Regions:
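Short, well-formed alpha-helical segments that are part of the catalytic scaffolds
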Residues: 14-28
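Acidic donor-binding segment of Leloir-type glycosyltransferases
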Residues: 25-64
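Glycine-rich, basic loop-to-helix element that forms the pyrophosphate-binding segment
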Residues: 66-82
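Short aromatic/hydrophobic "clamp" motif used to bind/position activated sugar donors
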Residues: 87
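Conserved donor NDP-sugar-binding/catalytic core segment of glycosyltransferases
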Residues: 100-136
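A recurrent flexible, glycine/aromatic-enriched loop bordering the glycosyltransferase active site
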Residues: 147-168
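Acidic donor-binding loop at a coil-to-helix junction in glycosyltransferase catalytic cores
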Residues: 184-190
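Active-site donor/metal-binding and catalytic loop motifs
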Residues: 204-222
Length: 242
């Protein structure tokens, strides 16, 4: 896959999580693994390269920026840095596991009609996975994000909103981009704009990224601040997940 796919990881203050993800790519993909690019905007003492130097040496490119450029800016820089037609994204507290079947996921994506294909995300202590397909609709100043899908083709559910573990065409991500002003409340904004632009999205229901959640130490997300900014941007009053 190294000639056509780049696995992009944005990380801050979770070096051991990032190390687990990098090792899992090697373990489950072997020599047929994608290129691995990591962008780290953490404080110097919590950098991936400082805390986990062995795993940092395993990546193909490590980009270290000034402190806290934000999730959105980090993802945009990774997309700009990658040279392959296809990129994979997942949060740094996920890993590739037996049910991820990353190589099969990429092949399935490349043979589909989609621009972005996500997987499910599963925390070990929860009975059901996250990331099931959702739709996006706006009415009366409210953005609704209910569970649902447009159609099912094989194990792929075509929809409008998915989780943060996905494979996509790089030029599509370059065209939509994540809003850097929204930092950590970027997700629904990205997929709302993607829907308006006609991006074709789906979930491969037979593929799962294990999710080992860890809160980053010494980092405040300030998510309510960015949620208010996102609502103002779209002229909305609230978001309902139903």
């Amino acid at each position: 896959m190294r000639d056509r796919v780049t696995f992009c990881i944005k990380t801050i203050h979770r070096p051991h999580c990032c190390a687990n993800l990098v090792r899992s790519i090697y373990e489950h993909c072997g020599d047929d693994r994608p290129l691995i690019y990591v962008l780290d905007d953490g404080k110097p003492e919590l950098r991936f390269s400082q805390v986990c130097p062995d795993e940092a040496a395993m990546v193909d490119r490590l980009i270290e920026t000034e402190y806290d450029i934000g999730l959105s800016a980090g993802r945009n820089r990774l997309v700009e840095a990658a040279q392959t037609r296809v990129v994979i994204f997942s949060d740094d507290d996920h890993v590739v596991g037996p049910q991820t079947r990353l190589n099969d996921l990429v092949r399935k994506f490349e043979s589909s009609r989609l621009d972005l294909l996500a997987t499910l995300s599963k925390q070990p202590h929860r009975p059901n996975p996250d990331g099931t397909p959702r739709l996006l609709n706006s009415s009366g100043g409210v953005l609704h994000i209910p569970r649902g899908e447009y159609r099912r083709i094989g194990d792929i559910a075509e929809c409008a909103f998915v989780c943060n573990c996905f494979v996509a065409y790089r030029d599509i991500l370059q065209a939509i981009r994540w809003d850097e002003d929204l930092k950590v409340d970027e997700h629904w904004d990205f997929f709302w704009r993607a829907k308006i632009a006609g991006v074709r999205v789906g979930v491969a229901m037979d593929h799962v990224f294990p999710h080992i959640h860890v809160d980053p130490p010494a980092y405040k997300r300030h998510r309510p601040v960015f949620l208010r900014a996102a609502l103002r941007k779209h002229g909305l009053r609230k978001v309902l997940w139903k």
